[in-house]
């Protein structure tokens, strides 16, 4: 018995023993599906989404519009379910302009939904700011109100160690403006009530300035922060992404390294003792967004990289992030194709998740990203676990 115990102990502590590997369940259709309420009018494009568990139910928000691009016909729907199959309409949102980035925050008996308001020009990215609506304990939603006084776009909202936090960015109107070096600000915020927000790092709401926009992060056991920022606009570090880290004693001092790949719509989480990322993958030989054309001007590079990226197929993928080396390794693709990747996930158990994502038909033709943006997209969910 003693020998068996020692063998098991050595196996558990052997650094050479294999680590748990990710496993994907079968995808399930959420949008469109027969489980949606009749009041929900699904248009060809269903994409930006979020999901959260609140008051014993699952709440799901998604955007639907004629296509991927900005539209005055955009609707947001908030649905509720007890089984993630049959859904009840909680709240429709329509404002005659584009709406994106729905983000939930469950706080006590209140559920907050933040969302970005943009213009309706399909050829422009025109952030107007963030609005919020609140569901009270009786299930009543408030009228949406403006939350910030600038063009802030929320990217993730969650409770971290008991504290509501949000990360997002301002200056998004510069992402597709190739005229000069951008000064987009990534802001890391905290709140006591979900409505009034200030800096996580006292006196320092901005943790990164440059070309970075969409950003997600995790907190390690030692309190260090590891983050992935989409750097589509480019800056002195190049284009693609930034992989960043800040130590617990100085959480506002982000040290970043450049990655030439662009992990659009980053979702970060921890499982099996490691750091994971779900984000878009460019289906080329090296996957790079930054093509290294340094003989061109900054403005010309920005245009060339964007045009090249639009012409390639995409996947929504699981990646592993090394929190020490600040490097990212490809792991596997979710069922995805064409216009895809705006993930959200529910934790369903230890190292188990229900992942929601949008895509063109994953069994259909391998469309370029721009082709897919004009096509029909679905929202799927599937289980992800580690064994």
Annotate each predicted stretch with a short phrase.
Residues 1-3:
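Positively charged n-region of N-terminal signal peptides that target proteins for export
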Residues 13-47, 52-100, 105-265, 269-338, ...:
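Beta-rich carbohydrate-recognition and catalytic domains
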Residues 340-342:
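Active-site pocket scaffolds in enzymes
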């Amino acid at each position: 018995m003693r020998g068996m115990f020692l063998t098991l102990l050595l196996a558990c502590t052997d650094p050479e023993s294999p680590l748990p590997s990710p496993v994907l369940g079968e995808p399930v259709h959420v949008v469109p599906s027969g489980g949606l309420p009749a009041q929900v009018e699904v248009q060809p494009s269903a994409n930006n989404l979020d999901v959260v568990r609140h008051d014993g139910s699952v709440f799901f928000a998604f955007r639907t519009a004629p296509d991927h691009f900005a539209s005055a016909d955009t609707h947001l729907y908030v649905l509720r379910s007890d089984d993630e199959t049959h859904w009840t309409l909680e709240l429709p949102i329509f404002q005659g302009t584009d709406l994106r980035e729905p983000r939930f925050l469950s706080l006590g008996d209140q559920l907050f939904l933040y969302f970005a308001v943009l213009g309706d020009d399909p050829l422009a990215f025109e952030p107007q700011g963030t609005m919020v609506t609140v569901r009270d304990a009786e299930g009543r939603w408030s009228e949406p109100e403006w939350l910030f006084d600038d063009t802030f776009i929320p990217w993730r909202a969650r409770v971290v160690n008991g504290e509501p936090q949000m990360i997002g960015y301002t200056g998004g109107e510069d992402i597709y403006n190739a005229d000069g070096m951008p000064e987009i600000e990534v802001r890391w915020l905290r709140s006591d009530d979900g409505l009034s927000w200030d800096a996580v790092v006292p006196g320092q709401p901005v943790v990164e300035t440059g070309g970075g926009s969409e950003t997600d992060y995790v907190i390690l056991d030692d309190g260090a922060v590891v983050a992935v920022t989409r750097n589509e606009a480019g800056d002195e570090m190049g284009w693609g992404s930034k992989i960043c880290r800040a130590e617990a004693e100085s959480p506002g001092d982000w040290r970043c390294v450049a990655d030439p790949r662009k992990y659009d719509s980053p979702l970060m989480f921890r499982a099996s003792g490691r750091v994971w990322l779900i984000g878009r993958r460019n289906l080329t030989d090296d996957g790079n967004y930054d093509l290294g054309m340094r003989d061109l001007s900054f403005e010309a590079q920005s245009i060339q990289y964007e045009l090249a990226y639009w012409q390639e197929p995409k996947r929504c993928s699981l990646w592993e992030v090394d929190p020490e080396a600040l490097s990212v390794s490809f792991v596997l693709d979710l069922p995805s194709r064409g216009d895809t990747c705006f993930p959200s996930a529910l934790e369903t158990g230890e190292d188990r998740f229900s992942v929601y994502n949008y895509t063109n038909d994953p069994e259909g033709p391998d469309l370029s990203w721009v082709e897919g943006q004009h096509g029909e997209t679905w929202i799927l969910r599937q289980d992800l676990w580690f064994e």
